[in-house]
Amino acid sequence: MFPMVTEFMNYGQQTVRAARYIGQGFMITLSHANRLPVTIQYPYEKLITSERFRGRIHFEFDKCIACEVCVRVCPIDLPVVDWKLETDIRKKRLLNYSIDFGICIFCGNCVEYCPTNCLSMTEEYELSTYDRHELNYNQIALGRVPMSIIDDYTIRTILNLPEIKT
């Protein structure tokens, strides 16, 4: 055939293919227009954390037997456990327990392997400070129960549900 006609046919096919690609991209854009916004207004809106969320560690001083299992299973040997051996009753008495959350990787091994369940993970994740030394929590700071975001009336909570694809 004539070279000019074949070039014109190729040009027409390329134009149709380009229009199809543009149409596909436009359809994807339109399908995203119906979705809810992903952005939340953080200080005033907060997501409800999942059930297995690993936040700040909560420590119950009365349950601890100073066995130091938490120190042995920690990948970075983080918890500092100070204890004294009571010779009359032949048991360890816990003096001090502290965790530096500036170093903690929140792996949860200490919580999982604690034989007396004196450690637990909370839903608290706002640990930022201006001074890194404030992240070193002793047993008193670790023993404070965080306020649930559901109970705070100034904050609108948003349930974080996974999308169900249909």
Swiss-Prot record:
Q: What is this protein called?
A: NAD(P)H-quinone oxidoreductase subunit I, chloroplastic
Quaternary assembly = NDH is composed of at least 16 different subunits, 5 of which are encoded in the nucleus.
The annotated topology with respect to the bilayer is: Peripheral membrane protein
Annotated organism of origin: Ambrosia trifida
Which cofactors does this gene product need? [4Fe-4S] cluster
Offer an example of a GO molecular function term for this protein: iron ion binding
Stretches that traverse the bilayer: none
The record's listing under NCBIfam families reads: ndhI (TIGR00403), NuoI (TIGR01971), PRK05888.1-3 (NF004537)
The protein's job, in short, is: NDH shuttles electrons from NAD(P)H:plastoquinone, via FMN and iron-sulfur (Fe-S) centers, to quinones in the photosynthetic chain and possibly in a chloroplast respiratory chain. The immediate electron acceptor for the enzyme in this species is believed to be plastoquinone. Couples the redox reaction to proton translocation, and thus conserves the redox energy in a proton gradient.
Domain (4Fe-4S ferredoxin-type): residue spans on this chain: 55-84, 95-124
User: Principal localization?
Assistant: plastid
Query: Of which family is this protein a member?
Result: Belongs to the complex I 23 kDa subunit family.
Q: Which GO terms describe its biological process?
A: photosynthesis, light reaction
PANTHER family assigned? NAD(P)H-QUINONE OXIDOREDUCTASE SUBUNIT I, CHLOROPLASTIC
Q: Where does [4Fe-4S] cluster 2 bind?
A: 74, 104, 107, 110
What is this enzyme's EC?
Answer: 7.1.1.-
Give the highest taxon in the source lineage. Eukaryota
Q: Give the InterPro entries listed for this entry.
A: 4Fe4S_Fe-S-bd, 4Fe4S_Fe_S_CS, NADH_quinone_OxRdtase_chainI, NDHI
**Location(s) in or outside the cell:** Plastid, Chloroplast thylakoid membrane
Instruction: Tell me the cofactor note.
Output: Binds 2 [4Fe-4S] clusters per subunit.
Gene that this polypeptide is encoded by? ndhI
Fetch the Pfam families from UniProt.
Answer: Fer4
Q: Which UniProt keywords apply?
A: 4Fe-4S, Chloroplast, Iron, Iron-sulfur, Membrane, Metal-binding, NAD, NADP, Plastid, Plastoquinone, Quinone, Repeat, Thylakoid, Translocase
The cross-references to HAMAP family, in alphabetical order and at most eight, read:
NDH1_NuoI
**One of the record's GO cellular component terms:** chloroplast thylakoid membrane
Q: Which reaction does it catalyse?
A: a plastoquinone + NADH + (n+1) H(+)(in) = a plastoquinol + NAD(+) + n H(+)(out); a plastoquinone + NADPH + (n+1) H(+)(in) = a plastoquinol + NADP(+) + n H(+)(out)
Specify which residues bind [4Fe-4S] cluster 1 according to the UniProt entry for this protein: 64, 67, 70, 114
